[in-house]
Amino acid sequence: MTGLALVTGASSGIGREYARRLAAQGVSLIAVGRRRERLDELAAEFPEVIVRPVVADLATRDGIEQVVAAVADQPVTMLVNNAGVAHYRAFAELPPEQAAELVGVKVLAPTLLTRAITPGMIARGGGRIVNVSGMIAFSGPASLEQVPLRRAVYAASLAHSVALSQTLHAELSPHGIHVQALCPGVVATEFHERQGMDLSAAPRMSAADVVTASLRGFELGETVTAPGVEQNDLLQRVFDADLAAFGGQSPQLATRYRS
């Protein structure tokens, strides 16, 4: 495999593993993260591959614009929108700056970075885009007894990744561009520890397995890849229900709402 991949959140976890996997296959990298020393270590690990470190905070508009400038006129063949942050707090107690950080990193940054590289992919006739989401994107209907995490903004931001991926895939697949929402469960990385959460007792998947599933998901033609879901028809039933609800609408007021 050759080409140029833009990987965000490449300092650790899934992003670092994805960057390492691609570099091992000869793919050049634009590696984005907030920790310069981690990005330099990544570059030193693959001296035979071009690895361009970009230190940027994607929670800020300046950080996003910095990365957009870094990829301007670059022939990006793959984008991995992996950068993430999680703030599990009761909604009424979530500091506004943390809510803004979540939306910036998981909604605004992936949207604008994808917008930046899409015209080039269309012109070149193909590409791959990965939006790293999570199974918690599907947890909206769950009660706090079922899922005790206070997660409203976080779950909503990941649900955005799924919807963006599905609708973009429909729009861009005629141009040879495959868009994938990658939805793991709990992963054995630094991610939750850096948010002050101890999930050491929880069953966790390795970042390596998550990346393996993503790459295999492209081969299988999946738009939503869930590494830990054995029965793929479970997800298909969710999507079929979405389409049934969308198709079941009418301009007439539903009977249950009539007095």
Regions found by a protein language model. Give the residues of each.
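A short, exposed helix-loop element centered on a Lys and neighboring polar residues
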Residues: 114-115, 166
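Catalytic loop of short-chain dehydrogenase/reductase
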Residues: 130-160, 166, 170-173
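C-terminal helical subdomain
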Residues: 181, 197-237
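Conserved glycine-rich cofactor-binding loop
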Residues: 11-12
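Conserved NAD(P)H cofactor-binding loop of Rossmann-fold oxidoreductase domains
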Residues: 82-88
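Conserved glycine-rich Rossmann-like NAD(P)H-binding loop of the short-chain dehydrogenase/reductase
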Residues: 25-41
